[in-house]
């Protein structure tokens, strides 16, 4: 850790230690700081690079740190033990005995209970990593294979419930299988609460998305952007006539019903971090970062 980064870490520890009081026992406090120190360099670099020039950068970091503390305090003890095991096992995910299996829940076993009933079969195959393709609540109608989520915290009703997912994660972990879930980062469905509130003209939620009153800027972007689905969804922007009362263009990299999130807005980062902690504390041992190359929009680039 470089001296200036070490100084930043020590300052965080000095200023923020009070947040841990009453949340955790002394052992967990010590483990939290050890793990935070281990990953602080990466965290500091990313946040400083993307948001360090903001006047409220320290305030935003304080909010993020507070949520880290809360999420760790809420984390089940077996998952805390697993965290330590993985931290002590270099490149555990690249071991030669790691064998992955990817499937849609309904195609493989009907629903989440069905997957629990097939864990022994997965063990026989030597599977140690199970990636269940998107199983959270999608929008009605076309949903890009489940990647157009209307509710990122609710399981599709035909597959089960959040409690079913939690139980499955426990059963898999006890059999030595890591559960992988998709963290859909780039977009939400237009039926998602954030999109609906943006549609209604709420300024807070309009800022969650990339929207344009006219084509001046978006035409400049369009000159260097590829088309992901040129036949079925040409272009990268969609006109939404009812948005905010006067209509606006929305950045839609994939389909017109998938609205790209605006990561230059720290509020979006806080929301996604909350979702990440939610899935991790449910028992997801791996989060697949969907469409990550498209997150940060820059004029003149291909994303």
Regions found by a protein language model. Name each.
Residues 1-265, 269-270, 281, 292-303:
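Acidic/aromatic-lined carbohydrate-recognition and catalytic surfaces
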Residues 279-280, 285-289:
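Active-site regions of oxyanion-processing enzymes, predominantly non-cytosolic
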């Amino acid at each position: 850790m470089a001296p200036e980064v070490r100084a930043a870490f020590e300052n965080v520890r000095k200023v923020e230690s009070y947040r841990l009081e009453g949340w955790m026992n002394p052992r967990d406090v010590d483990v939290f700081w050890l793990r935070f120190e281990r990953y602080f360099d990466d965290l500091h670099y990313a946040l400083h690079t993307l948001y360090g020039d903001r006047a409220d950068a320290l305030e935003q970091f304080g909010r993020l740190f507070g949520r880290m503390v809360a999420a760790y305090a809420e984390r089940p003890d077996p998952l805390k033990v697993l965290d330590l095991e993985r931290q002590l096992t270099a490149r555990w995910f690249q071991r030669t005995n790691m064998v992955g299996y990817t499937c849609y829940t309904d195609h493989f076993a009907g629903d989440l209970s069905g997957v629990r009933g097939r864990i022994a079969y997965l063990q026989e195959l030597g599977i140690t990593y199970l990636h269940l393709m998107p199983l959270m609540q999608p929008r009605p109608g076309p949903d890009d294979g489940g990647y157009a989520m209307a509710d990122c915290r609710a399981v599709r009703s035909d597959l089960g419930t959040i409690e079913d997912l939690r139980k499955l994660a426990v059963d898999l972990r006890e059999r030595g299988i890591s559960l992988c879930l998709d963290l859909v980062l780039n977009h939400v469905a237009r039926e998602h609460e954030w999109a609906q509130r943006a549609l209604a003209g709420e300024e807070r939620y309009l800022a969650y998305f990339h929207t344009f009153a006219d084509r001046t800027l978006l035409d400049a972007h369009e000159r260097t952007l590829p088309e992901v689905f040129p036949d079925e969804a040409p272009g990268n922007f969609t006109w939404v006539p009812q948005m905010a009362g006067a209509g606006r263009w929305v950045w839609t990299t994939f389909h017109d019903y998938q609205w790209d999130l605006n990561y230059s807005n720290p509020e979006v980062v806080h929301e996604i971090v909350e979702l990440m902690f939610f899935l991790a504390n449910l028992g997801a041992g791996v989060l697949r970062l969907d469409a990550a190359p498209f997150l940060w929009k820059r004029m003149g680039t291909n994303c």
